[in-house]
């Protein structure tokens, strides 16, 4: 059985996660930023038997979102559970044609003595974008989550007697879930932010004497700039800041002045966050780049030249392949994706570009297929492009990512069909209504011709050139 949790980070979300695992069922994580199309697809294709949500969270109009979902697409859904808290809007007796139960009423039930979980029992499904517009379902068993949590906790020092962890990553993703499990494995207190707010985060760090956190480098720099003291967070020792963006040296120097050890890492939903970690007690230039050493000695990383099919020697870049106990069981219900992902000897193709140093340290470079990392989530450009191409005026769309003062954002180019009038505001409004807000392009710009790379076998759009052009256009208009 699968249970969809469409919830923010709350104690109830934590309790429900462990409750589902104890039942021997599987959690399907659903981002609260998702809207009708995404929720319908994930809950429907996963076959989730129950959907649990918080009707009054963040003033989100959940009723309108649910009303836009076709109940017939949710063939497995049997019930809806409302996380009822003070001030929650009235909940109807039925949603999507299914009965609604209140979570508070369930708490009066007798505790279940049995534990149906187990090492090989499926525990968690993460959704991850692929080369098509529909996300894949990454299925993990209990064993990969538990063993990994214990090792990461030790490596990161979360097992220290005075450790307190600040959870800022959403629990629906691999980073947030691993953060939860490492705190539990180490019996370390965790402070939860339901919605990440940098000002509140700074206050919590001071008030709760937080020692460990995951905060992107851009946000942490802004937090430090807003403080009068050079060392505003004396308790904060270690921050995972993977996804570090330029200017690397300036950001890391700011962290060092604040006596914060920031480090990078490598991971993905398929092999879990923090599969490889940069050492903490090493010079700054050894901590700032993506990659690291495997946390579990039973794990392996190798690099393959996809043109020749041969494995690469040290310092030679190619596709990263991984193996070991942190790997997913499979892409659930997706034979085609599994066939493409696994090597014959059981190693997993990541779609990432990188190389190994002679000492075995992984150096991560980028996604091979130019996936977009927006608001900490990996997003397929095809997902954004498909929505833009629904407009009669758009013949073809291409989405890339650019750096802005508010972080990495999507930027789209469209070739017009001539069948209608181009309306940038309407296109962005459509994306905002159908997709999570962070997937909405910051700009949609018409283009006459795509930059192409022509080879004997294929003709490919040069996304790197589009990205450079988009960045230059944005920079020139925001001087």
Language model segments and positions:
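Conserved AMP-binding/adenylate-forming
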Residues: 1-37, 44-47, 168, 378
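AMP-binding/adenylate-forming catalytic core of the ANL superfamily
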Residues: 5, 34-41, 51-53, 213, ...
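Structural core segment of the AMP-binding/adenylate-forming
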Residues: 23-101, 416-420
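Conserved AMP-binding A3 loop
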Residues: 116, 123-147
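Conserved AMP-binding/adenylation subdomain of ANL enzymes
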Residues: 146-164, 172-212, 226-227, 270
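Gly/Ser/Thr-rich phosphate-binding loop
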Residues: 185, 210-214, 224-288, 300
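Conserved ATP/PPi-binding loop(s) of AMP-dependent carboxylate-activating enzymes
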Residues: 294-298, 310-341, 379
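Flexible lysine-rich "adenylation lid" loop at the C-terminal edge of ANL adenylation domains
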Residues: 309, 447-470
């Amino acid at each position: 059985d699968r249970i969809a949790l469409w919830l923010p980070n709350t104690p109830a979300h934590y309790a429900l996660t462990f409750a589902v695992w104890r039942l021997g069922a599987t959690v399907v994580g659903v981002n609260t930023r998702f809207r009708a199309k995404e929720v319908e697809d994930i809950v429907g294709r996963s076959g989730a038997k129950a959907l649990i949500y918080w009707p009054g969270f963040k003033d989100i109009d959940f009723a309108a979102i649910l009303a836009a979902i076709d109940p017939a697409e949710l063939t497995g859904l049997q019930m809806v559970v409302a996380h009822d808290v003070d001030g929650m809007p009235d909940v109807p007796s039925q949603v999507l044609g299914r009965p609604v139960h209140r979570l508070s009423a369930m708490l009066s039930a007798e505790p279940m003595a049995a534990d149906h979980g187990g090492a090989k029992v499926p525990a968690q499904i993460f959704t991850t974008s692929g080369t098509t517009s529909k996300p894949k379902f990454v299925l993990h068993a209990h064993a990969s989550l538990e063993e990994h949590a214990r090792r990461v906790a030790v490596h990161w020092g979360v097992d220290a007697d005075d450790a307190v962890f600040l959870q800022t990553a959403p629990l629906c993703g691999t980073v947030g879930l691993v953060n939860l499990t490492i705190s539990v494995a180490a019996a370390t207190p965790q402070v939860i932010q339901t919605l990440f707010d940098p000002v509140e985060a700074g206050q919590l760090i001071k008030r709760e004497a937080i020692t460990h956190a995951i905060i992107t480098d851009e946000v942490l720099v802004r937090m430090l700039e807003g403080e009068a003291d050079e060392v505003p967070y004396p308790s904060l020792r270690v921050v995972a800041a993977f996804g570090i963006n330029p200017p690397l040296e300036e950001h890391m120097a700011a962290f060092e002045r604040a006596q914060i050890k920031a480090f990078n890492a490598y991971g993905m939903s398929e092999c879990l966050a923090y599969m490889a970690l940069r050492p903490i007690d090493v010079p700054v230039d050894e901590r700032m780049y993506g990659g690291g050493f495997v946390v579990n000695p039973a794990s392996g990383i190798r690099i393959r030249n996809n043109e020749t099919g041969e494995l690469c020697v040290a310092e030679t870049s190619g596709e990263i392949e991984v193996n070991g106990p942190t790997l997913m069981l499979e892409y659930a219900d997706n034979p085609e994706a599994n066939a493409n992902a696994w090597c014959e000897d059981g190693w997993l193709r990541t779609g990432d570009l990188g190389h190994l140093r002679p000492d075995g340290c992984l150096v991560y470079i980028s996604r091979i297929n130019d996936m977009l990392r927006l608001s900490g989530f990996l997003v397929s450009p095809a997902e954004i492009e498909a929505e833009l191409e629904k407009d009669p005026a758009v013949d073809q769309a291409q989405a890339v990512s650019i750096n802005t003062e508010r972080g990495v954002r999507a930027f789209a180019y469209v070739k017009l069909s001539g069948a209608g009038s181009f309306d940038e505001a309407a296109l962005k409004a459509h994306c905002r209504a159908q997709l999570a807000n962070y997937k909405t392009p910051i700009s949609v710009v018409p283009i006459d011709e795509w930059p192409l790379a022509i080879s004997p076998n294929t003709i490919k759009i040069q996304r790197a050139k589009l990205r450079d052009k988009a960045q230059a256009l944005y920079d020139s208009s925001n001087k």
